[in-house]
Amino acid sequence: MSVLVISCNSEWDEEQYEQYISFKAPVGDKGVTDIYVRYKQGGEATYRLPMIVSGSLPNGKDRTVHIAVDTDTLDILNAARFGREDLYYVALESNRYAFPSTVDIPAGTFSTLLDITFNLDNIDLFKKWVLPLSIADDPSYNYEGHPRKNYAKALLRVLPFNDYSGTYSTTAMQVYIKNRDGSIDKSEAIPTTTRTAYVVDENTVFFYAGAMDEDLIDRDKYKIKFHFEPDGEKLVKITSDNDKIKLNQLKETSYTIAEVPDVTRPYLLHRYVTFSVDYEF
């Protein structure tokens, strides 16, 4: 006589993973998470940061998650990544943001959103502003933050944007060094492929002049503001707060805007700002 005994365990009735709490804030190659916030002169803008409960089963209980600012982690990142303090990420000033100290994740749900309100009036993007957040742990809390270091922390690089900021293709840009006698050798052009425009206000951005490197120690001296007049002839006017660079716009410049829907994702709109400007400094 033979007996066959079979044991069956419904593996999906038991939790396969710990139900840890984490931010959904993927870290980029620069050690932080870039977030883009619409610049509003005199107003506030809200960014919604996802928070999730890990696990293979639905969240089984109501959880109240505590959020804290974590400048220690930012200090560690700066020390490990940069050899110069002028390149450090800077903790965003406390008067420029607000968020609730706790967030509720109801039973039966896997995620929620942390609403962060920003006030970015007159912010100087010469500095690399970061809002460092952490999920606070305590034995009295009814949750655990994720033990992996990048999951329970969010280093949010705050990047305001307007209709003219972003990365520009500059493959056609030509930068020359003027000789002492005022002549220019056009065979010695300095090549550049892209330049980044940073927000100043709703209709103004700044670039670093010419081919100046964005990691230059005294790069702040070479900020050139480009003001895009939204009406009329759509002119571009350039200025600098530093008279010592002797900025001179050589000709009047206008700009055009083209908006093209994405071919495969119709909810996306590609916006192309085009202009040509001649200046010397």
Language-model features, listed with the residues they occupy:
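Intrinsically disordered, low-complexity regulatory regions in eukaryotic proteins
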Residues: 8-104, 113, 117-131, 136-281
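Multi-pass membrane catalytic core of lipid/isoprenoid biosynthesis enzymes
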Residues: 3, 105-107
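Sec-dependent bacterial lipoprotein signal peptides
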Residues: 1-9
